[in-house]
Amino acid sequence: MLVTVEFTYILILFFISLGLSIILFFLGYFLMFKVAYEDKLMGYECGFDPFGNARGEFDIRFYLVAILFLIFDLEITFLFPFSVSIMSMTLFSYSIMLIFLIILTIGFIYEIKKGALDWS
């Protein structure tokens, strides 16, 4: 019985926040100014006039480099706790981290072999 009462409060809070979100969404939608002009639809390039079509296509290699950056940035996120607690680690912890680094190294070698980082 006690658990049900606690979940009831959470459920009430959820529905209140959901209702408030829906009300604010429709209130903003109906009260906004709907005037579109050319300057508003134009792409923004750091305060300069665009050098052509700002909504043009990008080469897929830019997305690939961005994804690779995210993967290796996430690797650093996983390696940081390892480096902070290196003095209190066990052999099991070292083996898990070694497996993690081996998998990342294999992935990096695969990327190089497939030419993912070759821009020529």
UniProtKB/Swiss-Prot annotation:
It is a multi-pass membrane protein. The chain crosses the membrane at residues 10-30, 62-82, 89-109. It is found in: Mitochondrion membrane. One of its GO terms (molecular function) is NADH dehydrogenase (ubiquinone) activity. Its main location: mitochondrion. It comes from the Eukaryota. The keyword Electron transport applies. GO terms for cellular component: mitochondrial membrane; NADH dehydrogenase complex. Keywords: Electron transport, Membrane, Mitochondrion, NAD, Respiratory chain, Translocase, Transmembrane, Transmembrane helix, Transport, Ubiquinone. InterPro entries: NAD(P)H_OxRDtase_bac/plastid (IPR023043), NADH_UbQ/plastoQ_OxRdtase_su3 (IPR000440), NDAH_ubi_oxred_su3_sf (IPR038430). Gene3D superfamilies: NADH:ubiquinone/plastoquinone oxidoreductase, chain 3. It is an enzyme of class 7 (translocase). It catalyses: a ubiquinone + NADH + 5 H(+)(in) = a ubiquinol + NAD(+) + 4 H(+)(out). Its EC number is 7.1.1.2. Core subunit of the mitochondrial membrane respiratory chain NADH dehydrogenase (Complex I) that is believed to belong to the minimal assembly required for catalysis. Complex I functions in the transfer of electrons from NADH to the respiratory chain. The immediate electron acceptor for the enzyme is believed to be ubiquinone. Belongs to the complex I subunit 3 family. This is NADH-ubiquinone oxidoreductase chain 3. The gene is nad3.
